[in-house]
Amino acid sequence: MRQHQVADQLFGGGEMGALMRACDWSKTPLGAVEQWPQSLRSALSICLSSRFPMAIYWGADGLLLYNDAWRPIVGDKHPWSLGRPAQEVWPEIWDSIGPEFAHVLATGEGVFHSDERLDMHRYGYTEECFFDYTLNPIRGESGRVDGILNVVSETTYRVLSDRRTRLLRELAAKTSAAKTVEETCALMVEALSSDPADIPLALLYMVDPEAKAACLCTGTEPPPAVPYQPEQVCLAPPQSAPQASQGWPIAAVVQTAQP
């Protein structure tokens, strides 16, 4: 059977199916489609037919194949990522997932994680991501593990939403009994300091009675990347404010009452 006939039967529909049909696999490490082992064909058929995010990492190098639902997980690395070794696709998290891949291939035991944090670089910047995922062995005709089936659900938005909701509750609980402005500010900073992942820096400024300047009252411990926190910020219009205040749009916030 010719390669295009095998590909038509194997890859089915969908965006990824069309992309795989258009690929000349004979020029890749996977080789011509008609030479693929039945175990890979069967696993890929299940993967491409599923509406749940699934990917296959095949062979010792973990050559990556995936379905339409999994494609957003790789972000802007698609379509370059298709057919690439796992370590090339995920260098930023390989220290975390590489040993797990090796474990599955060596032992035939699956791996499961819930709300696992992985700091991924998939849209041009590093982002904090969370996933429920499994790594499941795919056994070949010889009985050994020849590949890994990755079933995954991204939970980033839920995890971040839950974490930020907890912070708001903590903020409300800590400040509810405060009796002075100074006490309120101190308790606010205490609450904000509990979540450095979402609030790496918080500075609380108090506006003077004449509304001419905002003075630093308190704040969280600044990270190394933020060496400068002005003690006082002029609330004059930008064109008349001192140079040191022009990078801090506090005046606009005070004047418009908008964030």
What are these regions (language model features)?
Residues 1-3, 153-163:
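PAS-associated C-terminal cap
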Residues 21, 61-85, 190-193, 197, ...:
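GAF sensory/regulatory domain recognition
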Residues 21-27, 38, 45-49, 92-121, ...:
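Soluble sensory domains of the PAS superfamily and closely related sensory modules
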Residues 33-66, 197:
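Sensory modules in modular signal-transduction proteins
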Residues 39-43, 59, 167-175, 180-196, ...:
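Amphipathic alpha-helical coiled-coil segments that mediate homodimerization
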Residues 116-118, 136-141:
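Output-coupling edge of small sensory domains
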Residues 123-125, 138-144, 210:
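Flexible loop/coil segments at beta-strand boundaries within sensory signal-transduction domains
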Residues 133-134, 144-154:
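PAS-family sensory domains
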